[in-house]
């Protein structure tokens, strides 16, 4: 563990939906869903907190969301707007440190260990950042402050929306002991069920197992959870982390024009992409569909979720949404492809049922 490290995790609250409510006062206080049309096999990219009260969450089929809340307002994502707002937020963060690691459009780690701002207080810096984001961008953010990345991330999730949580070396052990195992960074349904089966429900339950035992049960994840349970995370905030993507495309033997036939091919492609993600211990937030026509022109359509995914079923829900907005103009298709980008750090990668940064 590094001495005197001061790490802040900034996490924008319901980012896409909050931007839409900011820009359109008629949406404020209403259940708003950013994503696909419920009548066209779309998926939810994100939703407002008003919509979440109905059990709606990211990657849920839009039709399911509609059934849960028929009065919800559905709108298409405006990715260029979200990217512009993200740059505004990141510019603010960069004023406080030159060690900023964006994880996606709406969250980032900031290492303020050597910062002289706010008399060197990470807590005061986090509060000032939150205040500036609200005044200058018109949005709320949640902040976590701690001495490593794992605890800073857990802290930002603790009091959403518009909250701040500080985890010190003195209170970290108590915080981790009480933390439900499903809240641990990277622990999804599969690992959660495995741990529940051996009597692990909270952080304190992990302390009863040796590193060797956890590795035997969970593989490499076991070593990481062993360290997390003891408040250990030596990863550095990395402003130069390279963004990569994982994808697969197929050139068809014969040009096709039937949508159902395309869906069948995309099902196979998504299986391959999901397999690659699993093999590389990766998952991502952005799903991109590529379509090349028989005149060799091509188009891409993308959707960025507010949680990470790697499972084939979730990927295909997004792909079906994307293909529904492609204008084929009566042209035949000669190539189809799927790419997953905005990849998560290679720590513990597994599907999460809920949003990875919106609680």
Curated annotation (Swiss-Prot):
GO MF terms on file?
damaged DNA binding; DNA-directed DNA polymerase activity; magnesium ion binding
User: Can the keyword Aminoacyl-tRNA synthetase be found in this entry's annotation?
Assistant: no
Q: Which GO terms describe its cellular component?
A: cytosol
Which catalysed reactions does the entry list for this protein?
DNA(n) + a 2'-deoxyribonucleoside 5'-triphosphate = DNA(n+1) + diphosphate
Listed CDD domains: PolY_Pol_IV_kappa
Q: Which domain of life is it from?
A: Bacteria
Positions marked as site (Substrate discrimination): 16
Fetch the Pfam families from UniProt: IMS (PF00817), IMS_C (PF11799)
Q: How is the cofactor bound?
A: Binds 2 magnesium ions per subunit.
Presence of keyword Flavoprotein? no
What are the EC numbers?
2.7.7.7
* Cofactors: Mg(2+)
Q: Which leading EC class covers this enzyme?
A: transferase
Stretches assigned to the UmuC domain: 7-188
Q: Which UniProt keywords apply?
A: Cytoplasm, DNA damage, DNA repair, DNA replication, DNA-binding, DNA-directed DNA polymerase, Magnesium, Metal-binding, Mutator protein, Nucleotidyltransferase, Transferase
Q: Which residues bind Mg(2+)?
A: 11, 106
Write out the catalytic residues in the record.
107
Briefly state the protein's biological role. Answer: Poorly processive, error-prone DNA polymerase involved in untargeted mutagenesis. Copies undamaged DNA at stalled replication forks, which arise in vivo from mismatched or misaligned primer ends. These misaligned primers can be extended by PolIV. Exhibits no 3'-5' exonuclease (proofreading) activity. May be involved in translesional synthesis, in conjunction with the beta clamp from PolIII.
Relate the assembly described in the record. Monomer.
Question: Which protein family is it in?
Answer: Belongs to the DNA polymerase type-Y family.
| NCBIfam families per record | PRK02406.1 (NF002677), PRK14133.1 (NF010731)
Q: What is this protein called?
A: DNA polymerase IV
């Amino acid at each position: 563990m590094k001495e005197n490290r001061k790490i802040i995790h900034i996490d924008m609250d319901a980012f896409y939906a909050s931007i839409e409510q900011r820009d359109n006062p008629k949406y404020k206080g209403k259940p708003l869903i950013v994503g696909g049309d419920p009548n066209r096999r779309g998926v939810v990219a994100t939703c407002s907190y008003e919509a979440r009260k109905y059990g709606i969450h990211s990657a849920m089929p839009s039709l399911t969301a509609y059934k849960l809340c028929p009065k919800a307002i559905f709108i298409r994502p405006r990715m260029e707007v979200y990217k512009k707002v993200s740059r505004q937020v990141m510019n603010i963060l960069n004023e406080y440190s030159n060690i900023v690691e964006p994880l996606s459009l709406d969250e980032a780690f900031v290492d303020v260990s050597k910062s002289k701002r706010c008399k060197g207080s990470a807590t005061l810096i986090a509060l000032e950042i939150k205040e500036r984001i609200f005044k200058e961008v018109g949005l709320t953010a949640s902040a976590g402050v701690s001495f490593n990345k794992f605890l800073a991330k857990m802290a930002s999730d603790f009091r959403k929306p518009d909250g701040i949580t500080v985890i010190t070396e003195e209170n970290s052990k108590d915080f981790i002991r009480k933390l439900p195992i499903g809240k641990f960074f990277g622990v999804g349904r599969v690992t959660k069920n495995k741990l529940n089966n051996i009597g692990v429900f909270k952080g304190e339950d992990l302390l009863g197992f040796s590193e060797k035992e956890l590795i035997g049960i969970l593989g490499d994840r076991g070593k990481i959870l062993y360290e997390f349970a003891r408040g250990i995370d030596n990863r550095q905030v990395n402003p130069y982390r390279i963004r990569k993507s994982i994808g697969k495309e197929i050139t068809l033997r014969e040009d096709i024009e039937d949508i159902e036939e395309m869906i069948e091919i995309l099902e196979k492609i998504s299986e391959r992409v999901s397999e690659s993600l699993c093999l590389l211990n990766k998952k991502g937030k952005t799903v991109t569909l590529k379509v090349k026509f028989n005149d060799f022109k091509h188009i891409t359509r993308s959707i960025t979720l507010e949680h990470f995914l790697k499972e084939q079923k979730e990927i295909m829900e997004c792909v079906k949404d994307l293909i529904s907005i492609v204008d084929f103009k009566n042209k035949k298709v000669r190539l189809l492809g799927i790419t997953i980008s905005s990849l998560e750090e290679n720590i513990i990668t597994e599907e999460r049922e809920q949003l990875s940064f919106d609680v």
